[in-house]
Amino acid sequence: MGVFNYETETTSVIPAARLFKAFILDGDNLFPKVAPQAISSVENIEGNGGPGTIKKISFPEGFPFKYVKDRVDEVDHTNFKYNYSVIEGGPIGDTLEKISNEIKIVATPDGGSILKISNKYHTKGDHEVKAEQVKASKEMGETLLRAVESYLLAHSDAYN
């Protein structure tokens, strides 16, 4: 098994605490509402949202795969940090065991925030991660972030 780590950062004009509430804590409800072209539904299969919770994320028609199942590994409300692993569906299969993801939202001096994202692809055997998998994951994250950001800018009273 190999582990391939990819890190990225992206900025937002939304303050860290507000973005954490919307993007992380209520993303299950918000994503299908603000980005139905990316996520059609999120179903809580097991747990209460904390570590150990299993969620099924379903994608719309025409997507390369129908769903993924995520396991919540950590939710740190104080440091705006969220860790989860993709454990089933989507790219998980013959070549990938799981994908571990860490999202940390850091406040910036101008009142916005930086999302620091780390993706660890745990491969089976000597398989390598394809560049298009990493690109697709980054694009999905960016799509969701910008949709949530637009929603929050249009609804200044939400998630305060």
Swiss-Prot record:
SUPFAM superfamilies: Bet v1-like
Domain of life of the organism encoding this protein: Eukaryota
Cystine pairs: none
GO MF term set: abscisic acid binding; protein phosphatase inhibitor activity; signaling receptor activity
GO cellular component, one term: nucleus
Compartments it resides in: Cytoplasm
PROSITE patterns per the UniProt record, alphabetical: PATHOGENESIS_BETVI
GO biological process terms on file: abscisic acid-activated signaling pathway; defense response
Effect caused by changing N48S: Slightly reduced interaction with BV16
Assigned keywords, A-Z: Allergen, Cytoplasm, Pathogenesis-related protein, Plant defense
Name this protein carries in UniProt: Major pollen allergen Bet v 1-A
Organism: Betula pendula
